[in-house]
């Protein structure tokens, strides 16, 4: 995680005191130590009816002879100290909020950069490079979806995402037990002290919604004194199971509290791309930067010969058109008969199909 340190800037607003207007007129009957407003001397700088107190004076270390800041009396000094503590709390709160916002911005930037890889290889501008056999097919690097583990991936710094359709293991509740269905039918061969399910003697204990009974926690602690308790009193082997389940729940809660929020979050597996022709679904992993590097690599190219039948035209002049991507070549007058030239046309027409 990136730590963001914000320097605390000294703010002089909390050091500002209002000047007594009666003192400015020379009619204030209260002394400096009694008036709730400031009585600054002439050397102090007063602006808009306010004066700034001397910070060094609050610490008891001002050595200036004619200080332009106010040296407040004890009662105003106490007020300024309270203002200073409140201002420090506000600055720390603002710094913490700023650091949290910066952390969220960094996390969003990291997540947005994951989806910025090109999805298709770039085709070079050179025509022969368009038929480059070294350009990887867009389907290269695709992994079948069944080879990807179904377990979620843990990565740092991402906001937690919901996992639709993910069902975790069913945890045993520490205050309820499932009733034995065989016992309800009257054909349970296991005894009350051997069956892993509850054998309640009173049918009113059973909750019809989930077929469970509520455990009497006082009985487990050995202090149930009710004659007809409406809760189930489990045998010893079921008590051991309940205590183990309770311990497991406490351990899981402690482990969850140990993780910092935002450190490890679950993200779902990337959804597969369904093929319309019924082929195996695939997904695109983050290998496109390697694919892009191979695409931009300039390699020597072999001559391109298109597949299928080739249609040739008889030359009408001394310019013979060559294959795609090559430059036209000027040839001299033919010294051999036209029938020996591979591109010559027969007498029946000017087209020849190989």
From Swiss-Prot:
Molecular function as annotated in GO: RNA binding; zinc ion binding
InterPro entries: Znf-CCCH_4, Znf-CCCH_Muscleblind-like, Znf_CCCH
Disulfide bonds: none
GO BP annotation list: mRNA processing; negative regulation of myoblast differentiation; regulation of RNA splicing; RNA splicing
Pfam families named among the record's database cross-references: zf-CCCH_10, zf-CCCH_2, zf-CCCH_4
UniProt KW GTP-binding keyword: no
Gene Ontology CC terms, in alphabetical order: cytoplasm; cytosol; nucleoplasm
Keyword Zinc recorded: yes
Principal localisation: nucleus
Tissue: Highly expressed in the placenta.
Subcellular localization: Nucleus; Cytoplasm
Zn finger (C3H1-type) start-end: 14-42, 48-74, 174-202, 210-236
Keywords tagged on the record: Cytoplasm, Developmental protein, Metal-binding, mRNA processing, mRNA splicing, Nucleus, Repeat, Zinc, Zinc-finger
Similarity remark: Belongs to the muscleblind family.
Role summary: Mediates pre-mRNA alternative splicing regulation. Acts either as activator or repressor of splicing on specific pre-mRNA targets. Inhibits cardiac troponin-T (TNNT2) pre-mRNA exon inclusion but induces insulin receptor (IR) pre-mRNA exon inclusion in muscle. Antagonizes the alternative splicing activity pattern of CELF proteins. May play a role in myotonic dystrophy pathophysiology (DM). Could inhibit terminal muscle differentiation, acting at approximately the time of myogenin induction.
Name assigned to this protein: Muscleblind-like protein 3
Gene: MBNL3
């Amino acid at each position: 995680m990136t730590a963001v340190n914000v320097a605390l800037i000294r703010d002089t607003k909390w050091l500002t005191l209002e000047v007594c207007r009666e003192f400015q007129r020379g009619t204030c009957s209260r002394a400096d130590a009694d008036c709730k407003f400031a009585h600054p001397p002439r050397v102090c700088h007063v602006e808009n009816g306010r004066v700034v107190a001397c910070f060094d004076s609050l610490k008891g270390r001002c050595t200036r002879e004619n200080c332009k800041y106010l040296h407040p009396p004890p009662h105003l000094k106490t007020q300024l100290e309270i203002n200073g503590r409140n201002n420090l709390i506000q600055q720390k709160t603002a710094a913490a909020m700023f650091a949290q916002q910066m952390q969220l911005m960094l996390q969003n930037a990291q997540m947005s950069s994951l989806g910025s890889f090109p999805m298709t290889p770039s085709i070079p501008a050179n025509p022969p490079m368009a038929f480059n056999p070294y350009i990887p097919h867009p389907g290269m690097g695709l992994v079948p979806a069944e080879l990807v583990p179904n377990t979620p991936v843990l990565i740092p710094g991402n906001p937690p995402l919901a996992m639709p359709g993910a069902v975790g293991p069913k945890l045993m509740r520490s205050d309820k037990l499932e009733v034995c269905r065989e016992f309800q039918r009257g054909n349970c061969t296991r005894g009350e002290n051997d069956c892993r399910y509850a054998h309640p003697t009173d049918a009113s204990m059973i909750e019809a919604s989930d077929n469970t009974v509520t455990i009497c926690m006082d009985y487990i602690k050995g202090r149930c004194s009710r004659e007809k308790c409406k809760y189930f009193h489990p045998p010893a082997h079921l008590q051991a199971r309940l205590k183990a389940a309770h311990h497991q729940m406490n351990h899981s809660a402690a482990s969850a509290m140990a993780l910092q929020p935002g450190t490890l979050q679950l993200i779902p597996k990337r959804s597969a791309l369904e093929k319309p022709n019924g082929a195996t679904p695939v997904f695109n992993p983050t290998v496109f930067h390697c694919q892009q590097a191979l695409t931009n690599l300039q390699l020597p190219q072999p001559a391109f010969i298109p597949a299928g039948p080739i249609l040739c035209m008889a030359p009408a002049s001394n310019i013979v058109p060559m294959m795609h991507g090559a430059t036209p070549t000027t040839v001299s007058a033919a010294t051999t008969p036209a029938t020996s030239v591979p591109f010559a046309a027969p007498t029946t027409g000017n087209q020849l199909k190989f």
